[in-house]
């Protein structure tokens, strides 16, 4: 079988993190089996679809490196044998209308002239009788004359699919196993609007068939659409693709992931300083695991190890703490040159002037606490003291400089440092330890005041490497300043 899968988002807002996971699982499935990953833009919602949202889809997929083999591109061009890949363009090309006409001619669809008010009254009547809100088929058997009379009133019809009501619809779900819906629980869904635009359920059936999709892998929220779509495949005499429905993503409280749980727009994660590779690794584990319960994957490894059989049925819980841990692991493994490139936009965003710092020095400064960064966005705040005047942590001065020996320590170590040349880590450490020993101090009585004086922090990077990177002039200046307010 030729493996063909698709990611088919609607451009009605930002690209949701759940959408990215759906794209990822389709991408991995295609790569695992040498198949084709297709992007199709389902922009048949004339009121809500926007070009800005389409660009946001490109932004999200490009940042996460989920690059498609077929589909539209940012520049308006398309690649693939089944263009166009925007459903609005397919409407203009008349692709859907002939299939609407076919169903009408065969009695498998009908025109419905009911107004929104009439439909609401039907829903209320069904609710009063404790029946499901299923369209009762009022317009199913209208004569040509009755249709003409309604159109003379100015009514424009929708087209409804004539849903079979006998038996059941069954399929072997790739993730959930056997699934069955009673046909009596389905309804005559609208497949074409008065504008001539097809609805989601109809357009995706036509496109998935014409584009030769072998597997449809999508969220669990689509599972109720599947029996209706299968009935449409049967109406045309087509073989449906295989379906697999991914588990929902929930927040830590067990409810559907939403903004109250944190960011849901994939680009927000980019802005917050997450590495795309880390986010992709994390999303792969939201509802899937391999037999080794592996957590971290090397480049290209997910493509080799992904197996749809490893996808779970129960909802996946989005754990921000685990994502932070995973991102820190990826940051730790990133070569310092690349990490510096990634960090620079965040540094500039905080208006930290690095223009007078050469590249090698900047890399050394960023590297000094590389093992501690959880996100790129944390880097500016942790290195700011290298470039700007010290801003003391709350309580840092009182904690360190209120001690009786602090002023003598600072003045004494300043004299020691003035005589060190070159101002290097090893020499600084040796001289500091010698000063402590010679003057009867514990090393902590020296290290802590010096650290706070030069960085404003009570904890931080390796002390003597930090002093070397700050440079002799800056260190001496800051120590002298600190001595002025010692013994406060």
UniProtKB/Swiss-Prot annotation:
The keyword ATP-binding applies. GO terms for cellular component: cytosol. Its EC number is 6.1.1.17. Keywords: Aminoacyl-tRNA synthetase, ATP-binding, Cytoplasm, Ligase, Metal-binding, Nucleotide-binding, Protein biosynthesis, Zinc. It catalyses: tRNA(Glu) + L-glutamate + ATP = L-glutamyl-tRNA(Glu) + AMP + diphosphate. A motif ('KMSKS' region) lies at residues 256-260. ATP binds at residue 259. It is found in: Cytoplasm. The keyword Protein biosynthesis applies. A motif ('HIGH' region) lies at residues 9-19. Catalyzes the attachment of glutamate to tRNA(Glu) in a two-step reaction: glutamate is first activated by ATP to form Glu-AMP and then transferred to the acceptor end of tRNA(Glu). This is Glutamate--tRNA ligase. It comes from Elusimicrobium minutum (strain Pei191). The gene is gltX.
């Amino acid at each position: 079988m030729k493996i063909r899968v698709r990611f088919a988002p609607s451009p009605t807002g930002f690209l949701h993190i759940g959408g990215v996971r759906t794209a990822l699982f389709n991408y991995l499935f295609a790569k695992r089996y040498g198949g084709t990953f297709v992007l199709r833009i389902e922009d048949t919602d004339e009121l809500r679809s926007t070009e800005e949202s389409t660009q946001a889809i490109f932004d999200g997929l490009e940042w996460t490196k989920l690059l498609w083999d077929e589909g539209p591109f940012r520049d308006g061009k398309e690649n693939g044998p089944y263009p166009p890949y925007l459903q609005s363009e397919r409407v203009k090309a008349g692709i859907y209308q002939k299939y609407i006409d076919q169903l009408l001619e065969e009695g498998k669809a009908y025109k419905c002239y009911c107004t929104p008010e009439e439909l609401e009254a039907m829903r209320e009547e069904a609710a009063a009788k404790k029946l499901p809100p299923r369209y009762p088929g009022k317009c199913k058997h209208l004569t040509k004359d009755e249709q003409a009379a309604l159109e003379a009133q100015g009514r424009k019809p929708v087209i409804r699919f004539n849903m079979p009501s006998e038996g059941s619809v069954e399929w072997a779900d790739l993730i959930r196993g056997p699934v069955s819906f009673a046909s009596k629980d389905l309804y005559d869904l609208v497949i074409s609007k008065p504008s001539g635009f097809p609805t989601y359920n109809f357009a995706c059936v036509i496109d998935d068939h014409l584009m030769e999709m072998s597997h449809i892998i999508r969220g669990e929220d689509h599972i109720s659409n599947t029996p209706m779509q299968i009935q449409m495949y049967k109406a045309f005499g087509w073989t449906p693709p295989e379906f697999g429905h991914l588990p929902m993503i929930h927040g830590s409280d067990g409810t559907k992931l939403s903004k109250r749980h944190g960011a849901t727009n994939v680009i927000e994660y980019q802005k917050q300083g997450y590495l795309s590779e880390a986010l992709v690794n994390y999303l792969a584990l939201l509802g899937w695991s391999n037999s080794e319960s592996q957590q971290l994957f090397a480049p290209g490894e997910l493509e080799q190890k992904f197996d749809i059989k490893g996808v779970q049925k129960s909802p996946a819980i989005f754990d921000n703490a685990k994502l932070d841990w995973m991102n820190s692991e990826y940051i730790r493994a990133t070569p310092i040159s690349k990490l510096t490139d990634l960090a620079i936009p965040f540094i500039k965003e905080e208006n930290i002037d690095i223009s007078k710092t050469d590249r090698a020095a900047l890399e050394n400064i960023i590297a000094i606490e590389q093992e501690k960064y959880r996100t790129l966005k944390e880097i500016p705040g942790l290195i700011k003291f290298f470039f700007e005047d010290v801003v003391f942590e709350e309580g840092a001065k009182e904690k360190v400089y209120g001690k009786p020996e602090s002023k003598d320590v600072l003045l004494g170590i300043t004299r020691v440092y003035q005589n060190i040349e070159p101002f290097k880590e090893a020499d600084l450490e040796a001289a500091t330890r010698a000063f402590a020993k010679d003057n009867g101090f514990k090393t902590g009585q020296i290290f802590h005041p010096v650290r706070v004086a030069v960085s404003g922090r009570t904890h931080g990077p390796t002390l003597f490497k930090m002093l070397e990177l700050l440079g002799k002039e800056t260190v001496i200046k800051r120590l002298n300043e600190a001595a002025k307010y010692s013994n406060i």
